Amino acid sequence: MNKFSFTKMHGLGNSYIYVNMFEETIPESLLSSLAVKVSNVNTGIGADGMILICPSEVAPVKMRIFNSDGSEGKNCGNGLRCVAKYAYEHGMVKDRSFFIETLSGLVKAEVTVENGAVTNVTIDMGKPRLKRSEIPMIGLDAERVVAEPFEVDGKQYEITAVSMGNPHVIFYVDDITTAPVTTLGPIVEKDERFPEGVNVEFVEVVNDHELHFRVWERGSGVTQACGTGACAAVVASVLNGKTARNKETVVHLAGGDLIITWTDEGNVRMTGPAETICTGVYYY
């Protein structure tokens, strides 16, 4: 029987099983199936997926993320904050500002430390990708997808689509408590107009610096939080004139709050907590 040590961590309730690949060895061919198994709340550990903290040739660490359905994702805002916390607290980095490699590129992390423990992490998520081909999405001739008509099962909606290294589509709602997360979410996630699938966000605008947010994540379903989704929601809200550029926006997620800023320089900055839940050994 094989085994590996793990740390379970969460960012605003978005939990993953973190594996230190500097110390552990898991066959590449088993990563997808193991992500499914460890995520299972009944027969595994229970999580939204599995994240590997790996050696990198271009940064102190590299993050690989596997969703609970076994698919490999390119980016994860909540995961990045937890990787930053783990890397700093385990001595993988000494500076409080450092880079993390992801499948969608390098991102910069800055940790806030109190008594040797990381309490908050700010991630520079880079520039949003706004071209239809970058999301990607099939549809109208317009280069950007902003307040675009979108029909699902005979009903008309308006959507805005943004990539933060992974694809997001935003629906605005009047009341976040009645948002059709579990009904519309899974349909849109696999809509053929999004050839790589899509994360589906529902946003209620409170004012010009505050949003309520719920998400149906590609490959995971309903989660307590989605960092890249919160970033995409703020970018979409600026594009639609609902919030302001270069101004902090508080995004209220099911698991807590993130502070997001789309700077005048073009990058999106995300600040929020990261917490360790437990450590253990998984047998397979």
Swiss-Prot record:
It catalyses: (2S,6S)-2,6-diaminopimelate = meso-2,6-diaminopimelate. Keywords: Amino-acid biosynthesis, Cytoplasm, Isomerase, Lysine biosynthesis. GO terms for biological process: lysine biosynthetic process via diaminopimelate. Its main location: cytoplasm. GO terms for cellular component: cytosol. It is an enzyme of class 5 (isomerase). The keyword Zinc does not apply. The record marks 168, 217 as: Could be important to modulate the pK values of the two catalytic cysteine residues. InterPro entries: DAP_epimerase_AS, DAP_epimerase_DapF. The keyword Cell cycle does not apply. Transmembrane segments: none annotated. Its EC number is 5.1.1.7. Substrate binds at residues 14, 67, 77-78, 166, 199, 217-218, 227-228. Pathway: Amino-acid biosynthesis; L-lysine biosynthesis via DAP pathway; DL-2,6-diaminopimelate from LL-2,6-diaminopimelate: step 1/1. It is found in: Cytoplasm. One of its GO terms (molecular function) is diaminopimelate epimerase activity. The active site is at residues 76, 226. Catalyzes the stereoinversion of LL-2,6-diaminopimelate (L,L-DAP) to meso-diaminopimelate (meso-DAP), a precursor of L-lysine and an essential component of the bacterial peptidoglycan. Belongs to the diaminopimelate epimerase family. Homodimer. This is Diaminopimelate epimerase. It comes from Geobacillus sp. (strain WCH70).
